[in-house]
């Protein structure tokens, strides 16, 4: 049996169904190009008959994708199949993906057809699709709830008709791994021409088993896995392809299969799709979550510093993640604190670890997460966070006009002096406030990340803004919380400015100490 698993991505079709608003043609093309760059074998780019916009998206993507095979969805209707072929005609090679329900529940309550009629519809549609391409895939919708006899019967007839890929969907995420494995195993045992087609699975995550089901299907003989990047999709989502891909790589010793995926592109592609679709990745998400390679426990941090393999089963760089740091929290031990100080260029003789660690624990209990610049302040200024609030926002106002420009006025208390900045105009209220604040402090910064998280529901919900900026090649974090998004954004930037000021104070003190020592 072939040891290569084909990766079929349906982020642009099934995944888009999870979004509150449809993606633009430009956004879909950007995602498709990223998927192609990652080495995805088959990209299902849409359902052309569903809307003129989807037709145009499929058409545009088909003209631009050269290395991955393009695929479009179609019902067992002539107009669907014709539209799919027309939308993809400019592609080097394309696949038409036809689907029809085969479970008794769907046949009786949705389609009002008997099984013989279902078979006739399926075969007729396959023959029409074969006029346009020799690459036809057929999905037996709700296959996991279809009787085994019926499933074997229709699969055999579809293969005889010329279908190259038979897809077995767990449409409602009802199946558990040993059940899906049994279905695939039975197909291989009972369908005489099964070797003439690739068996695929398409799992949904309603019971949280999509990835587990996909892996069990591979072990039973399936050689195509369908899913989406980050597992996005209707209801609880689809199989998270990045998890299946890395599981295949890490556990090749057990699974005995491989893919053609460029693993180092996975993290980048995941982030691109998250941003374009406006679907934040949960921190604890396997493979691509921000905590996937993070360590907070002191015991774990010590073990990782001695040998990453103690608590990591793969290298972060294997998915294209360049920078991985230990989280400094109240659970961190001395080893992690020492590691951060060493990373910043300090020797153990430059500070007293016992005093630093005691101060660190106090700050961590108050603040939650501590950053490198916090450690510097504790080590060399010996002051807690609240004692170092040099800047405080005493007043701000924003006026926006219809052309998109906004004017911000701010009053910032800086130590014992009050500076007033007004009439700073920019594109949008938040950027206007940020420019006004920066003109007061004269800190050259680059905003690298802005994240808004809703805390609660309704008009009184709080908006938490987390930002990450770069200042003189160092990263600084800031957080603001308020019912007004603009206010929380301003608070976050003031938080950043205080952190930069604190770091500058440390640098000035260290310079003076060096002069004295010299």
Swiss-Prot record:
Claim: Amino-acid biosynthesis is one of the keywords in the record: yes
Gene Ontology CC annotations of this record: cytosol
Positions bound to Mn(2+): 14, 202, 204, 238
GO molecular function terms noted in the UniProt entry: 2-isopropylmalate synthase activity; acetyl-CoA C-acetyltransferase activity; manganese ion binding
Top-rank taxon: Bacteria
Residue ranges of every copy of the Pyruvate carboxyltransferase domain listed in the record: 5-267
Pathway this chain belongs to: Amino-acid biosynthesis; L-leucine biosynthesis; L-leucine from 3-methyl-2-oxobutanoate: step 1/4
Keywords, sorted A to Z: Amino-acid biosynthesis, Branched-chain amino acid biosynthesis, Cytoplasm, Leucine biosynthesis, Manganese, Metal-binding, Plasmid, Transferase
GO biological process: L-leucine biosynthetic process
Subcellular location: Cytoplasm
EC number: 2.3.3.13
Region feature (Regulatory domain): 392-518
Reactions catalysed, as given in the entry: 3-methyl-2-oxobutanoate + acetyl-CoA + H2O = (2S)-2-isopropylmalate + CoA + H(+)
Cofactor requirements of the protein: Mn(2+)
Subunit note: Homodimer.
Function, as annotated: Catalyzes the condensation of the acetyl group of acetyl-CoA with 3-methyl-2-oxobutanoate (2-ketoisovalerate) to form 3-carboxy-3-hydroxy-4-methylpentanoate (2-isopropylmalate).
Protein family (similarity comment): Belongs to the alpha-IPM synthase/homocitrate synthase family. LeuA type 1 subfamily.
Protein name: 2-isopropylmalate synthase
């Amino acid at each position: 049996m072939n040891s290569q698993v084909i990766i079929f991505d349906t982020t642009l079709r099934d995944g888009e169904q999870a979004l509150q608003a449809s993606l633009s043609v430009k956004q879909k093309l950007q995602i498709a190009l990223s998927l192609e760059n990652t080495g995805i074998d088959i990209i299902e780019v849409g359902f052309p008959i569903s809307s003129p916009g989807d037709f145009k998206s499929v058409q545009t993507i088909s003209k631009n994708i050269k290395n991955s095979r393009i695929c479009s969805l179609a019902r067992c209707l002539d107009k669907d199949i014709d539209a799919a072929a027309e939308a993809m005609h400019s592609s080097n090679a394309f696949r038409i993906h036809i689907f029809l329900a085969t479970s008794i529940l769907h046949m009786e309550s949705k389609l009002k057809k008997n099984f013989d009629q279902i078979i006739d519809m399926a075969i007729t549609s396959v023959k029409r699709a074969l006029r346009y391409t020799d690459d036809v895939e057929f999905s037996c919708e709700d296959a996991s709830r279809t009787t085994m006899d019926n499933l074997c019967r229709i699969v055999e007839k579809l293969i005889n008709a010329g279908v190259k890929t038979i897809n077995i969907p767990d449409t409602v995420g009802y199946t558990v791994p040993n059940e899906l494995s049994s279905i695939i195993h039975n197909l291989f045992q009972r369908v005489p021409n099964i070797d003439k087609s690739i068996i695929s699975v398409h799992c949904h995550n309603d019971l949280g088993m999509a990835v587990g089901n996909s892996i069990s299907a591979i072990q039973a003989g399936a050689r195509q896995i369908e899913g989406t990047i980050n597992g996005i999709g209707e209801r609880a989502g689809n199989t998270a392809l990045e998890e299946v891909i890395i599981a295949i790589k890490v556990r090749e010793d057990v699974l005995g299969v491989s893919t053609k995926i460029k693993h180092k592109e996975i993290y980048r592609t995941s982030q691109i799709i998250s941003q374009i679709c406006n679907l934040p990745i949960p921190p604890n998400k396997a493979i691509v979550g921000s905590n996937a390679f993070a360590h907070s426990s002191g015991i774990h941090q010590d073990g990782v510093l001695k040998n990453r393999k103690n608590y990591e089963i793969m290298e972060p760089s294997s998915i294209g993640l360049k920078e991985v740091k230990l989280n400094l929290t109240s659970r961190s031990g001395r080893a992690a604190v020492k590691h951060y100080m060493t990373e910043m260029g300090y020797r153990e003789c430059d500070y007293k670890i016992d005093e630093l660690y005691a101060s660190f624990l106090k700050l961590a209990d108050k603040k939650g997460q501590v950053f490198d610049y916090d450690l510097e302040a504790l080590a060399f200024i010996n002051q807690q966070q609240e004692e170092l609030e040099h800047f405080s926002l005493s007043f701000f106002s924003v006026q926006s006009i219809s052309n998109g420009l906004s004017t911000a006025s701010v009053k910032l208390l800086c130590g014992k002096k009050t500076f007033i900045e007004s009439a700073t105009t920019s594109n949008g209220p938040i950027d206007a406030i940020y420019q006004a604040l920066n003109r007061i402090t004269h800190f050259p910064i680059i905003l690298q990340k802005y994240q808004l998280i809703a805390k609660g529901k309704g008009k009184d919900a709080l908006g938490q803004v987390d930002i990450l900026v770069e200042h003189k090649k160092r990263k600084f974090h800031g957080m603001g919380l308020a019912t007004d998004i603009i206010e929380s954004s301003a608070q976050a930037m003031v938080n950043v400015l205080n952190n930069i000021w604190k770091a500058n104070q440390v640098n000035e003190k260290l310079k003076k100490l060096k002069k004295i020592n010299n």
